[in-house]
Regions:
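Short gly/ser/thr-rich secondary-structure transition/capping motifs
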Residues: 27-33, 108-109, 132, 150-153
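Flexible gly/pro-rich beta->alpha loop and the following alpha-helix that scaffold active-site loops
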Residues: 2-5, 9-77, 194
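Cysteine-nucleophile active-site neighborhood
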Residues: 43-121, 186
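Acyltransferase
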Residues: 177-241
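Phosphate-binding/catalytic loops
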Residues: 5, 171-180
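Catalytic beta-strand/loop cores that center a nucleophilic Ser/Cys/Thr
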Residues: 113-164
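Histidine-centered divalent metal-coordination motifs
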Residues: 79, 133, 173
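Proline-centered loop/turn at the N-terminus of a beta-strand
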Residues: 1, 74-76, 92, 128, ...
């Protein structure tokens, strides 16, 4: 099972749909409806941290979850989730010089291959992708545990890969209908996480340019839970994967 942390963003169900189209079970839980300990009890095969309308400091359990699970379970952060990964490991998230919302951009990446950034394996560079964000990760604050693997014009960080663990962040939206090779990127993550193997299944063509600000889809049949936590220390102390 892949656990998808919902940071109150309508893109989350696009992510869930793409992952299910790749043949995996997805459980969607909002960032304030579960504790870190409860996530550990679920023993997900991988964790995906969704986009959201806020900064990492207001993303519910997301930062604490990364601190507790990095190196224990594979993690993919998308947009806000990408920023959460940086923030949880000491990186700075700063305001972008120019916010972009719904902009299709060319993303230059490192072509993946056998390196830690295999997220881009089989995907042409530059990649056409959709960006919705006002904040960016400051690459000067990442240290040597993260490697920047993709950039936009001006050198803005668009993706990073952890140098020791299976953890990746992407600032853009692979689940947007205007992003090319979004399914492939998610499949590469699932392969790196050992959730799937072999050739990628045939998936539906993305829908025409979506109606709405966030290319949102119906909640449909995806499983979403509200598990209201009592007051609890969200640190990783005492948690065992």
């Amino acid at each position: 099972m892949v656990l998808l942390i919902d940071n109150y963003d309508s893109f989350v169900y696009n992510l869930a749909r793409y992952l299910e189209e790749l043949g995996v079970e997805v459980e969607v839980i909002r960032n304030d409806a579960v504790t870190v300990a409860e996530v550990v009890e679920r023993r997900p095969e991988a964790v995906v941290i969704s986009p959201g309308p806020c900064g990492p400091g207001h993303a519910g359990i997301s930062v604490d979850l990364v601190r507790a699970s990095l190196g224990q379970v594979p993690i993919l952060g998308v947009c806000l989730g990408h920023q959460v990964l940086a923030s949880a490991t000491g990186g700075a998230v700063v305001r972008a010089t120019r916010p972009v919302h719904g902009q299709v951009a060319r993303i230059d990446h490192d072509q993946g291959g056998a390196s830690a950034s295999g997220l881009f394996s089989g995907i042409e560079s530059p990649l056409t992708a959709t960006r919705y964000h006002s904040l960016v990760v400051d690459p000067e604050t990442l240290g040597d545990e993260w490697r920047v693997t993709a950039r936009a014009d001006g050198g803005l960080v668009m993706a990073m890969a952890h140098t020791r663990h299976v953890a990746f962040g992407v600032q853009f939206h692979p689940e947007s209908v205007l992003t090319v090779s979004g399914h492939r990127l998610l499949w590469n993550f699932l392969c790196a996480a050992d959730v799937v193997s072999g050739p990628m299944p045939v998936v539906p063509d993305p829908a025409p340019a979506a109606q709405g600000h966030h290319d949102a889809v119906s909640l449909g049949h995806y499983r979403s839970e509200s598990i209201f936590p009592d007051t609890e220390d969200l640190s990783s102390n005492g948690l065992h994967w």
